[in-house]
Regions:
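Oxidative protein folding and maturation machinery
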Residues: 1-201
Length: 201
């Protein structure tokens, strides 16, 4: 696709392309809401439908480079974050919003000189993402949805089974939604039973 071919550009050039595309979408969106009697929620959803996918493009660009690259310390690159809401409960089940927040968590969880592709299957990285949720996300509903998503990624990684208990201990410390927590515990137990030589659940 057009944007996929632009990830090799500098941060400044990539930003300019995304900003230009977003401005075009914003202008069309303004025309749309001026011609229609949209509710405030409809306005929010229609704007979020292009705002957060473009923000996610910027976040993914940074993730590809990881903290081993200058992009992480380039505060100008991350200016787009200033216009985003990280605790919007009304968008808690809106996929583009959650996808962006998951990318944001991953960027924040990376250590110095660590790349996303080397870290993403690591239990310690998922524990750090849980810690970022606890420290950065204030809305309880959003916090639970994001933590559940991270927990699923961890538990479904069979290579990490030996470390799942360590992760679950960290997950339990953020006072998760009990239904979600029980769901994750049950999933982990079932997957553990599927290991070689053990009966299926």
């Amino acid at each position: 696709s057009f944007l996929s071919s632009k990830y090799s550009l500098s941060g400044k050039s990539f930003n300019q392309i995304i900003d230009s595309l977003q401005r075009e979408k914003y202008i069309n969106w303004k025309k749309l809401i001026e011609k229609n009697d949209f509710s405030n929620f409809s306005k929010k959803i229609t704007e979020a439908s292009f705002k957060y996918p473009y923000a996610n493009r910027k976040a993914r660009y940074a993730l590809i480079r990881g903290k081993s690259k200058n992009i992480k310390i380039d505060s100008a690159y991350f200016k787009y974050r200033d216009k985003l809401n990280y605790n919007d409960e009304e968008l808690s089940f809106f996929e583009p919003y959650i996808s962006y927040l998951m990318s944001y968590l991953s960027i924040e969880a990376l250590e110095k000189d660590e790349t996303f592709y080397s870290a993403k299957n690591n239990t310690n990285f998922n524990i750090k993402r849980i810690e970022v949720i606890e420290n950065k996300i204030k809305n309880t509903k959003l916090k639970n949805i994001l933590a559940r998503a991270v927990a699923y990624e961890e538990i479904m990684n069979f290579n990490n089974q030996i470390s799942h208990e360590k992760f679950l201990e960290s997950y339990s410390l953020i006072d998760p939604n009990q239904e979600y927590f029980n769901e994750i515990i049950g999933l982990n137990k079932s997957l553990m039973q599927m290991r070689a030589g053990r009966p299926l659940p």
